[in-house]
Amino acid sequence: MSTIAAKPLSSSMSDGLSFMGFVRQGGLVGVRNHLAIISTVALCNRIAELAAQRHEADTDEPVLQIKGEFQRGLQLADAQLQNQVIRQLIEHPNIGAALVLCHDRRSAQAWQKLFTNKPVEVLAVMDGEGVGSTIELASQALERLGQEIRGYVRVPCPFSTLTFALECGGSDASSAVCSNPAVGQFVDVAIAQAVAGVDKGVG
């Protein structure tokens, strides 16, 4: 464990910091520009995987896959919470565009009404004529969405538009024994720039 005190920050380390990010509608800023495919029900997981693999093979562009192992049959508050989490993932500023996969048309219609601030397409598996047809429809949608985000460019953004998730422990044998001076020094810089942060302490 380290017993060396962290050096005080110089003003040059915290003055006028910026980064190159993707500005989204509503003012949020992303540091990534992911094309994502989101399966809202486990029945769609394999279709999401195969459609993503086909797009990656055709374009050499990565697709962020977001899937769950159990998503169907939840009721009331449980279903609302699950849908809220999925929606917040789609709205994350690091996602530039998203394809949402549902099982039935009714669910697809509900999801289609939710997103207006970024390119999002919703596809119901029941709209396809079997798995192969649905994979083809999903691949076509990914291509359209990919074309949308290829035109996005990074622009200078103030450091204060970032939100950081921090973990102070779990990285070495000294976790929960002593503090992490690197995290502490970073937080000092972040606070000086009015950055939001969420810390997960391990101990």
Would you name each region that the model predicts?
Residues 1-167, 171-203:
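Metallocofactor- and cofactor-centric catalytic cores in central/energy metabolism, strongly enriched
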